């Protein structure tokens, strides 16, 4: 996997309307590109402005946490962001892909969203999200946290063909059960 570090200009995207599927007003991608390498990914088809080969090369927004702090701060000079769900992850890159183990941008972003009382909705295919159960429980108590997993199939063999870089469905289903037992709303699609 190739890793490229960049300085981003902004991190949060405001949707024109609240996303009816993910109930989010804002979205963010801490990484561009995704090492999960799912064959059906729309990011692969669209290219999503990824340098290098989609599915193998990942761009890391190394200043994402500084930008997020500035953007979430209610004292900012521009119009402050309304407290509404922030969608973490999506088509441009899974926030819990393998590079997250090294950079921990997602965990740091969650800590900031907790500090500023923003609810979160995380879309992932990775069981690495279990690492952050402590901060997700705090966010859930304060404002709300939702964890969603996507599946191409619940058959481990079929999934291995279409989603070669992700944990098998049985592990993702166990992770959903884990979060449900922790009192965090979960979904799958």
PLM segments and residue spans:
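Conserved Radical SAM active-site core
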Residues: 1-148, 152-160, 169, 173, ...
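Gly/Pro-rich active-site loop or hairpin
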Residues: 166
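Short beta-strand/loop segments at the ligand-binding rim of alpha/beta enzyme cores
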Residues: 181-189
């Amino acid at each position: 996997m190739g890793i490229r570090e960049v300085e981003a200009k902004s991190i949060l995207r405001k949707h024109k309307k609240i996303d009816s599927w993910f109930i989010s007003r804002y979205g963010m991608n801490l990484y561009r590109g995704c090492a999960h390498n799912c064959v059906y990914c729309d990011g692969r088809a669209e290219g999503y402005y990824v340098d290098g080969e989609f599915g193998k090369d990942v761009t890391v927004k190394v200043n994402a946490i500084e930008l997020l702090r500035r953007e979430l701060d209610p004292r900012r000079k521009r119009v402050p962001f309304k407290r509404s769900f922030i969608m973490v992850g999506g088509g441009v890159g899974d926030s819990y892909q393998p590079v997250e183990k090294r950079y921990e941008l997602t965990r740091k972003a969650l800590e900031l969203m907790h500090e500023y009382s923003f609810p979160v909705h995380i879309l992932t295919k990775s069981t690495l999200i279990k690492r952050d159960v402590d901060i997700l429980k705090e966010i859930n108590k304060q404002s709300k946290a939702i964890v969603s997993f996507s599946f191409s199939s619940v058959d481990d063999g079929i999934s291995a063909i279409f989603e070669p870089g992700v944990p098998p469905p049985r592990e993702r289903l166990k992770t959903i059960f884990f979060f449900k037992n922790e009192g965090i709303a979960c979904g799958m699609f």
